[in-house]
Amino acid sequence: MSVTIKDVAYIAELARLSFTDTEKEKMTSELNAILQYVEKLDEVDTDGVEPLSSIHDEVNVLRDDVRQESVPNETALLNAPDKLDRFFRVPKVIG
């Protein structure tokens, strides 16, 4: 399979991209190089090779949920430019 300049122009039109003739030629040659590489990969003998979805055997390695002390409200609010009771006050950003 190979890509033609006409194919590149069509795909560019679908993507609402505009290329010069030189860019179309370059894109055509680059896409053809990629397709040639993929065809080479297709020639590799993979009989007996188990398909992988990941190179790691581990799945969802998570740490245990351990309760930790957090910063006290008073300490967190020490440098707050504006506060109300135990909350930060921020400027209104939504009308």
From Swiss-Prot:
This is Aspartyl/glutamyl-tRNA(Asn/Gln) amidotransferase subunit C. SUPFAM superfamilies: Glu-tRNAGln amidotransferase C subunit (SSF141000). GO terms for biological process: glutaminyl-tRNAGln biosynthesis via transamidation; regulation of translational fidelity; translation. InterPro entries: Asp/Glu-ADT_sf_sub_c, GatC. Allows the formation of correctly charged Asn-tRNA(Asn) or Gln-tRNA(Gln) through the transamidation of misacylated Asp-tRNA(Asn) or Glu-tRNA(Gln) in organisms which lack either or both of asparaginyl-tRNA or glutaminyl-tRNA synthetases. The reaction takes place in the presence of glutamine and ATP through an activated phospho-Asp-tRNA(Asn) or phospho-Glu-tRNA(Gln). Keywords: ATP-binding, Ligase, Nucleotide-binding, Protein biosynthesis. Belongs to the GatC family. Heterotrimer of A, B and C subunits. The lineage of its organism: Bacteria, Pseudomonadati, Chlorobiota, Chlorobiia, Chlorobiales. GO terms for molecular function: asparaginyl-tRNA synthase (glutamine-hydrolyzing) activity; ATP binding; glutaminyl-tRNA synthase (glutamine-hydrolyzing) activity. It catalyses: L-glutamyl-tRNA(Gln) + L-glutamine + ATP + H2O = L-glutaminyl-tRNA(Gln) + L-glutamate + ADP + phosphate + H(+); L-aspartyl-tRNA(Asn) + L-glutamine + ATP + H2O = L-asparaginyl-tRNA(Asn) + L-glutamate + ADP + phosphate + 2 H(+). It comes from the Bacteria. The keyword ATP-binding applies. It comes from Chlorobium phaeobacteroides (strain BS1). It is an enzyme of class 6 (ligase). Its EC number is 6.3.5.-.
